[in-house]
């Protein structure tokens, strides 16, 4: 049905449950995935878990976009993940930008509930770090090194893209 509307932009349905093998997807997930021009996915996992997810998703031969990834409390940091996305040529953005009413700098409620039930399961979880947001309410960065890294790698990606577009 969507293709009949002749969309002018690529279509995507997010692969957000962490199921990257088509044969393990539900029928509705497969339908969305099969009709997507771009693979978009969420992964708050570790660096190694993201490498494995990327390996599986690249096998489909489509552009990839990670739409949720930053989880500082769980060890998933800008310093680790943004260079990986840059090197793998994966677009990304994170959930939350400026700390505010939505409180995406806080861990999710289910994390707090899980901690209350089983603190040992969160032994490696650093509750002193912000979960998502990049900027404070003052609009200063949470960590200037993060935003500097993002700006530097985005500038490199833009330059690489410009070079590919300039070639005959």
Task: Walk through the language-model features, giving the residues of each.
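Substrate-binding clefts and catalytic carboxylate motifs of secreted carbohydrate-active enzymes
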Residues: 1-168
């Amino acid at each position: 049905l969507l293709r009949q509307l002749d969309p002018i932009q690529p279509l995507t349905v997010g692969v957000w449950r962490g199921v990257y093998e088509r044969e393990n997807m539900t029928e509705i997930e497969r339908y969305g995935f099969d009709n997507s021009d771009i693979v978009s996915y969420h992964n708050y996992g570790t660096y190694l878990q993201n490498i494995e997810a990327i390996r599986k998703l690249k096998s489909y031969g489509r552009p990839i976009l990670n739409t949720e990834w930053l989880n500082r409390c769980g060890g998933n940091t800008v310093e680790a993940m943004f260079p990986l996305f840059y090197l793998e040529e994966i677009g990304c953005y994170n959930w939350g930008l400026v700390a505010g009413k939505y409180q995406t700098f806080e861990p999710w409620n289910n994390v707090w509930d899980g901690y209350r039930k089983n603190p040992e399961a969160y032994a490696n979880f650093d509750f002193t770090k912000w979960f998502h947001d990049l900027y404070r309410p003052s609009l200063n960065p949470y960590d200037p090194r993060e935003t500097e890294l993002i700006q530097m790698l985005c500038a490199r990606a833009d330059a690489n893209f410009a070079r590919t577009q300039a070639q005959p």
